[in-house]
Structure formats: structure tokens, C-alpha cells
Amino acid sequence: MGDKRVVLNKDIFFQRAERLYELWETGQVGLDSVNSIAVAYGDSENPYTKSSALHSWLFGHEINDTALLFLKDHIYILGSNRKVEFFGTVTGVQYNGRVPPVSTLLRDKSDKDAGNFEKLIDYIKRAEGDLGSFVKEKFNSDFVNAWNDALKADDINKTDVSLAFMHLFAVKDDKELELVRKSAQVTTTSWTAARQRYVEIIDSERRVRHSVLSSEFSAYMKDPKIQQSLAKYNADTCYDPIVMSGGNYSFKWNHDNSEAHLHNQFGSIITSFGARLSDYCTNLTRTMLIFPSAELEAAYEAILAAEFAVIAALKPGVKLKDVYKIGVDTLTEKNPKLAETLNKKELGFATGIEFRESRLSINAKCEEVVKEGMVFIVYIGVDSIPNKNKGEKGKPAAIAISDTILVKAEGDNEVLTEKAKSRLKSNVIKFKEEQENRETERDTDQKKLLGRGQRSVVLNDQTRNKTTNEDLRKERQKELGKQLNLNAKARLSKQDGGTDEKKVKKSNVSYKNEERFPQDTDVQKMLIFVDRKYDSVIVPIFGIPVPFHISMIKNCSQSVEGDFTYLRINFATPGSQVGKDNAQFPHPLAHFMKELTFRASNIKEHHSDATPPSSNLSTAFRQIKEMQKRFRTEEAEEREKDGAVKQDKLILSQNKLNPKLKDLLIRPNIIQKRITGSLEAHTNGFRYTSLRGDRIDVLYNNIKHAFFQPCDNEMIILLHFHLKNPVMWGKKKYKDVQFYTEVGEITTDLGKYHHMQDRDDMHSEQQERELRRRLNTTFNSFCEKVSRLTNDQFEFDSPFAGLGFFGVPFRSATTLKPTASCLVNLTEWPPFIVTLSEVELVHFERVSLQLKNFDMVFIFKDYKMKTQMVAQIPMSSIDKIKEWLHTCDIWYSEGIQSLNWAKVMKTITDDPEDFFENGGWTFLDAESEGEDAGDDSDESDAYDPEEADASDGGSSSASDEDESEGEETESDDDEEGSLDSDESEGKDWSDLEEEAAKADKRREVEDGGRDRDRDRDRKRPSSSKAGPSHKRRK
């Protein structure tokens, strides 16, 4: 089991065990005579066995030296002490009445488990019938060999149940498909790096052996720089990556990579590899064509068409032999000669925990039927393809294409490795050679301008097809736009069509009955009385004491004029409060009193009176103010509690090895003093405990997003939890909580003297680097332990620093970084978090060539939510953001103007049917279509350095040019047009940019010379010293 502490996922175990017993009850696929199934597992040279697959499928891990016995009424597990503890969560539990209870037996090594084997064999004999097992599997384990010897000694009749478990493993559940998709992502990411590696090798003409490249590609699976967030899964390879070129090709999966050098001049390079993530396999095979002939390109297209036909034919209910026939027929139709050298053994096979399931092979004899949820590796390989180019008799080439696909009942099957493009133009490498014969003088000038040409690699989709990729992105955006309107219309139609209910102001009754009405002397004397107990003010109106709740009093004021004191009370009435928190009154059509004014004398009426009559007004004024302040504070606390939830009780784990981080600070300042504490993971949540003893609990089921941001290029390292529902801590509710540690010095003494070779500074920098490395390792280890503790149900997401861009989400400029599911800024406070799954669309505002910045607006699927804006994003980031949104399948639009989104969203929510009948969100795309037309016209007037130089030369020396020079310029223009057409076919963007840069630099030099001439003219002596001008000289 390894050194890492693992936990058995109880739910997955019982759900999959239930599937096993359901299949067993049917008595199909060889289980009709089986009354018990025994599986003993140990070390084996073969990594793909049914025994190991059963362990991974049920337990999530391979557990050596254990024996499993499945009976109709019981499950027995034999293992060591530590392994028995692993199964503790499922022992003695009967799940759903279908899975029998589980019991564990502790191994006894003193008698080499003879007693335990005797018990298990006794259970098998009582069950009667045959014993199901994987008969053909062999292990290098004394434990497994002893178990097999014990079965032989008792003459137990065995039946091979491999076919039954093949059917059981073939159809994947949702958890399995999630792992398969991640495995495919690792595979395609590794291919992207491998493809770039081929380009570097061929461009530099390096000699690299096939075996060396195989080792490099294998390392790509675990390289954090390549896999980024997927590196934490520690994916392995399904087999040693296969690299073939130079005529030595084989379609066997156990092919040994030769020590020969990669043939990088012409022909084909075949690469096959696959990732194995959490024991689930995926695979892809790609063929790079180097300087191919037209025949070789046609062969590639035919083989690709055959692969597409096989993928389309893999639908539920279809026999695999029929799928095979469709693939062969398609290739024969496209190119009959290729069908003769096709690898006809099979055109693919099912995959999963086992890389290759031979019983589910796409061949001419397989009678098995395709089912929804199966995962297949489709593989089309053709050998001995003639490869003649440029008169050279090249070695025969081979082409192989493979992808991993998921079978779906409706719609097209999902190609899991689709990101590794298999189309021809993405896998063709051509050379751009220096043209040696230059016939015209203009060609010589052009050569001087561009510099000496060099041989370089040009991927076919690097030049002309870059525009194609942009077109594909636009096409995809159009599809997303159409789907967006359809989905939004359907979603809003399911919701209630009524308008939003306005918030009704709470109706506060001062006294619910007469018994509670106070009988104070002030009330009897018709004076103003402030009742603190019931938050009411009793005032006399026409000789009757009338109570008003403090919530109905808007404000009050007191003034002294002469011998009288005035108290003015203003009441809250409909329409008197303006703002977003304005609430509707319970009875808005009733009659309301707007204000009351009371007057009292400042002079005592009798000498015996202790106070003048106005003292009642002064006392009432003071008490009303105090009561208003207290009531509004209580109201604010009630509003703060609105929407907050009470979390479940944290279940503390008594395990001393719980994941724990120390010396952490917390944001926001839930704890008054800025003191550190520790964060510990428990059974159902986290607990943060400060040094002072303050405790803050965060439960797993209330965490919407969990982020881990390393301290690379940051001053803090942090863990951030974005909650589903706000939680009350103290008297405030919070939806975000962050635990962090500061790294290095945030402030620097600018007055301190520094020397570049100061040993203290060098030592402190080295210490800071070591601290950063240690903190990253510690935090990353904490996240991995939490994932294992929760059986991968709780994972931390990390921002992608390479995709970050600057923007202003609130008041200050920050770096916004995408994650797998969000766009975040966690360093500044308050944090900025946008969940991408909640985003309907993104609109870019103020997009113009004249502006350096633009704004980005997020519109959410819940149209009642306020839109989120990120302002002041540099224009240089717009292409990167568009590509990121495109990969996330989020529709975006752009425009020059800034929109009033509050009014736009109100218009939509008031009448959504009319909005979508008039085109829906396409009104945002109207400007972009017009801009596209403008872009096309701009592209037709593309910049050309020669044309620019010709125009500059003509304007600067028009008076001195003769007719012959003008004729030469015209001829140059004609030649220039032909050059442009050549450039569109051969030059890539990097060359054109270099060409434009050199032309700009040369023109700057010429302009600088003319500027210096003008400066010298300004500094010449005056005419009194230099004599009269030429015009005045006679």
C-alpha cells in the first residue's frame, strides 16, 4: 500500500460491489455455476491483470498479499493488521440489502496462514458449486502460491470468471469517466510538448536516438511545468513511449525503441504513448509527415477518414466485427492500395484499468456488442507506403493514427484526445529553403533588407492555417452564441414568469394588546413618553396618547426660539426613502402622517415646578435619538444574518496524523488581534485554532471552491476557501476565508546601503529562496493529504500564473489568474472570484485601436445577479483572454461603447420572451460583425516594407527625380506585387514581423537624419552675419 496513508471510499466500494452482485444474480457470462469467487493478489510482472483491476476498481488501490472471498451471503477479506484497518469502514455493514456484510481475517504468519486458508476453503465448500477465479494469472508471491496450493490440495473445482469481470469493468461510471478524462488530458498535454520537441530537433538538425526521445516523452507525464495542475496526480505511462522513423516500423505495443537516430529529413515519424492516471489508461498515436509527397498526404487523409468512420460506428448495440468492417471498407473506398498493407489484426480495443481488453477487440471475429459508457482506443496503422520525393528513393513510410473515445448513446461519441489534433495540416512539417537564384535587382535589395535566409521548419498550420485557426475559433463562437440563446430561452421559460417580489418592510406593532400599553404618569399627563421596552414613542394627538414604533420615525430635530422649544418628528412614508434598499410598506395605499411638531415653554408655570415644560421635549429628543441608534444597530445585525447558514457540527478526528499547517494568519480579521494559528483537517471539515484559543470551523460540504496559491513571485502563500453559503463568525457573515503565511520582507529600508556583493544580502536571498521552496512543499503536501483523506472528493485548485493578466476588479490594479473553474485574484483583499460555470457570456467594452485598455464584463446565467466588471485591462492581453475563454466554451463579444448593464439586465428580466424573439444576445455581436468587415479591408492593405520605402523615397526627393527613376519605380511596384504573392505562400508570421521591424528601423534612421538636418538649419547664424538670402542677392 506504500507509505502514504490511504482511505477506502466506502460509497464507491458498496456501489461497485452492488454492480458485481447484480451481474452475479443474472447468472450470465459464465457465472451460472459459480457460488463463490476468490481472488488472491500479490506481486506480478504483468501490471495489467484482472486481480489488480478488481482491487483498483473496488478499493482505489492495489493491496498486495490479500485474499478476497465473495459468497452470496458474505464477503471475507484476509490481510495483515494494517490492511485490516484499511477495510474497517466497511466491516460489518450491509449495504442496501444487496451487498452482504464484510468480515476481515487477520493473517497469521506463524503457520503461513494455513489456518486462515482452511477457514476460507471451508466457506467455499459450504457454498457448494464451482469457485470462480482468474485461472490464468500468475504471481511472484509466496502468499498467493500458498493459497493456490491449498486449493489444489482440497481439489476445489475452479471456473474462469475473467469474461464476467471484463463486462463488469467495460462500462464506466461517472467517477471512472472523470479519471479517464484527466488521464486523456495528461496524454494530450504531453503530446503538445513532444510535438514541439520534434520541431526543435528537426529545425536544428540534431541527432537524437529513438530511445532517448522515448525517455523524454515518458518524463513529460510527470513534469509540473507541462502538466501544471495535473502533476499532483503523479500519472505514469501505460507503456514505454514508442518512437519510430526511417523505415523501421512496427504496430506491436511491446515494440522496443531502437538506438538508431531519428530520421528527420523526410518520411514519417510515428509516436505512441498513453497516460495511466489512478490506474485508468488512455492512448494516442500521431504521425508527423516530414516534407511529404502528395501521395503520402493523400494516404494520411484516407487513413484519417477510416479512423473517423470507426469512431462514428462505435454506437450502443453495434457488434465490434461490424465496426471493423466499416473501417476496412472506408479505407478501401478511399485508397484500395492502403487496404492491402493495413494492420488487419485489429482496429482498436476497449481500455480502462487494463490498457488492452483483448476480448473487446475491434476485429473481424469479435461478436461482443458496444455499450454506452465504454472507452475504446481506436488504432489505424498502415505500413509499406511508397515515399518518393524530389527524385530520391526514400524508405517506405508508415502512418498510424490512434485516439481514445467514449461511447455515447446520443449525439457524436466523445473523442477524449481531441485536443491533440490529428488533421493533416497539424502534423506536416515542411522546410523553407533559401532561394539562391535572384534575377532582379529588387530581389537583391529585398535580400539585404531581410537578411540572409535560413533553412527553418514550418509547421503547415503555422502560416496560412493560423488564419484558419482564427476562423475555426470564430465558427465555434458562432455556435456557442446560437446555443447560448437557445439554452437561456429554455432556462428562463422553466422559471416562474412573474416579476420579482419587492421586499416588504417589516410591520412592527408597538403593542399587540391593551394590557401591554404603559400606564406611566407622563402618558396620563399627555406628555411625550419613550417606551424603551417596546421600542415605541407615545405622543398626544387631540388629547389621545398614540404610539408610534421607532421604525416609523425617520428623524427628529429640536430647536429653541425665544421662550419656546420645538420638537419636530418626521415619519417614514411611502416615497420618502430613495435608494436600493428601499422597501415597500405593508399598506402603501393607507393614509400616513408625515410629521408632527410639538411646542413647549421654557418658563416654569409655577415656582414650585422643578423643571419647565420644555424639559419633556428635550428628554424625549435625547431618548428618541438613543433608541434610533440602538434599533438601527440591531437591524443591521439582522440584515447581516440574512442569508447566512448555520454549519453542521465539526466531527473531530482523533488521529494524530491529521493534515496540519502551523503559523498561519487569517483574512478577513475575524479574530481581533493579528495572531497566528494552526489549520487542521478533520473528518468533515477544517478547524483553525489561534494561539489565543479562538476557533473557526469550515466544513467541506459548504466549500464551493478551495484554492492553493504557491508563493512563486508572490509575497504570501495561501489557502483560500470560497463558501457556498455565508457563515456567521462573530457578528458578521463571511463568504470567503483565507489562511496565509507571509514570505520574505514586505517592506524594504531604502536608506540602507547595499552592495552587489554584500554577503549578508546574498545569504538572506538564499534563505528566502529556501523558505519559499520549503513552504511550497509543505502546503502542497497538506493539500495532497486532504485529498487522500477525503478520497479525492475534495481538491484544491491552483491559479495558472502563465495565463494571468492585469486588471482592476475593484479599486486597485491586480493580476487576475484563471484556474480550472474560476477567474481569481487572491492576493489582494477583498478577493475577486468568478465561477466560470455560472457565466453566461463575456463582453469586452471600449475595444478600439486608439485605446490602450479595455473593460471586461461577466454576465451570469442568473440574470438577477449583478454583472461583474474588470476594468483597465491592457489591450495586449485581449487575444490571450479570448483564447482562454474559447477553451472554456464561453461565448464572448466586443464593442466600442460602454453599456449601462443595470438597464440592459432590467430590460431582459422584464420581458425575456421579447428579448429572445428579437435576437437575444446577438445585439452585442452586431458591432463585431461590422468590425470584422473593416478588418478584412485592412488586411488587403497590408504593410509592405518595399512599398513603404518607395513611397518615402518618392516624397522626399520628388523634385530631383527624373523620368527614368519614375519608370524604375513603376517596374519595382510590379515586381513587388509578385513578391507579395510569393510571401503569402512561403513566409510565416515571424518573418513578416521581422521584415516590418527592419523596415521601421531603417525609416527611423532616415527620419532621424532629416531631423538633424532641420536642427542644423535652425541653429545657423542670422542673416546679418551670413549676408542676404539668395532671393535678395543680385
UniProtKB/Swiss-Prot annotation:
Quaternary structure and partners: Component of the FACT complex, a stable heterodimer of spt-16 and hmg-3 or hmg-4.
Basic and acidic residues biased stretches: 433-448, 463-481, 493-503, 984-1020
GO BP annotation list: DNA repair; DNA replication; transcription elongation by RNA polymerase II
Pfam families membership: FACT-Spt16_Nlob (PF14826), Peptidase_M24 (PF00557), PH_SPT16 (PF24824), Rttp106-like_middle (PF08512), SPT16 (PF08644), SPT16_C (PF21091)
Database matches in Gene3D superfamilies: 2.30.29.150, Creatinase/methionine aminopeptidase superfamily, Creatinase/prolidase N-terminal domain, FACT complex subunit Spt16p/Cdc68p, Pleckstrin-homology domain (PH domain)/Phosphotyrosine-binding domain (PTB)
Compartments where located: Nucleus; Chromosome
Region annotated Disordered, chain positions: 433-511, 926-1034
Lineage of producing organism: Eukaryota, Metazoa, Ecdysozoa, Nematoda, Chromadorea
GO MF annotation list: nucleosome binding
SUPFAM superfamilies membership: Creatinase/aminopeptidase (SSF55920)
Main location as per UniProt: nucleus
Name of the protein this chain belongs to: FACT complex subunit spt-16
Stretches with biased composition (Basic residues): 1021-1034
Function of the protein: Component of the FACT complex, a general chromatin factor that acts to reorganize nucleosomes. The FACT complex is involved in multiple processes that require DNA as a template such as mRNA elongation, DNA replication and DNA repair. During transcription elongation the FACT complex acts as a histone chaperone that both destabilizes and restores nucleosomal structure.
UniProt keyword list: Chromosome, Coiled coil, DNA damage, DNA repair, DNA replication, Nucleus, Transcription, Transcription regulation
Biased composition (Acidic residues): 926-950, 959-983
SMART domains associated with the record: FACT-Spt16_Nlob, Rtt106, SPT16
Family that this chain belongs to: Belongs to the peptidase M24 family. SPT16 subfamily.
GO cellular component: FACT complex
Coiled coil: 617-642
